[in-house]
């Protein structure tokens, strides 16, 4: 049985980012994490580790009986997409609220990484947590719709990460 989590807002996650004993809460769709993302092109070349730690947006966090929590994330990049429909731009105010830089950024909707929580590729920020915060619900919906359109055409590459 799979249990899906729902989008959270930055306000609802802010006070709950660290659990007693140093554990991190299970991420919710829309949460933004620091993660060593492995691009599909890198995985195709045989790489197993992402070359750069970057913000990623949680697309899905699902409980699989016996396996744990499987988390799917989409990368945020400074590179503008070749095709506008391949990414969703992150507004400057959202980047500011997350504590990200001022450069233009996009959420890529044509590929994702999938891993068992808390995989080895999460990267703690200054506060010891990998959480930047969460994107607004309306931006999450745009990202999810973009992924859905590409998935319907068989154009979303899923890179499974080592546990």
PLM segments and residue spans:
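C-terminal terminal-subdomain/extension
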Residues: 1-17, 83, 90-163
């Amino acid at each position: 049985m799979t249990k899906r989590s729902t989008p959270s807002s930055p306000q609802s996650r802010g006070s709950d980012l660290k659990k007693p004993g140093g554990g991190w809460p299970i991420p919710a769709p829309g949460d933004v994490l620091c993660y060593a993302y492995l691009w599909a092109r890198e995985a195709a070349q045989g790489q197993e580790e992402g070359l750069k730690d970057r913000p990623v947006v949680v697309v899905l966090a699902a409980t699989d009986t016996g396996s744990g929590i499987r988390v799917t994330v989409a990368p945020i990049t400074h590179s503008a997409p070749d095709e506008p429909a391949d990414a969703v731009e992150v507004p400057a105010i959202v980047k500011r609220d997350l504590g990200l830089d001022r450069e233009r950024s996009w959420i890529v909707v044509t590929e994702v990484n999938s891993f068992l929580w808390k995989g080895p590729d999460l990267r703690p920020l200054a506060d010891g947590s990998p959480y930047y915060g969460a994107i607004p619900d309306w931006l999450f919906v745009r990202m999810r719709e973009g992924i859905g359109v590409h998935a319907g055409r068989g154009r979303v590459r899923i890179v499974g990460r080592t546990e």
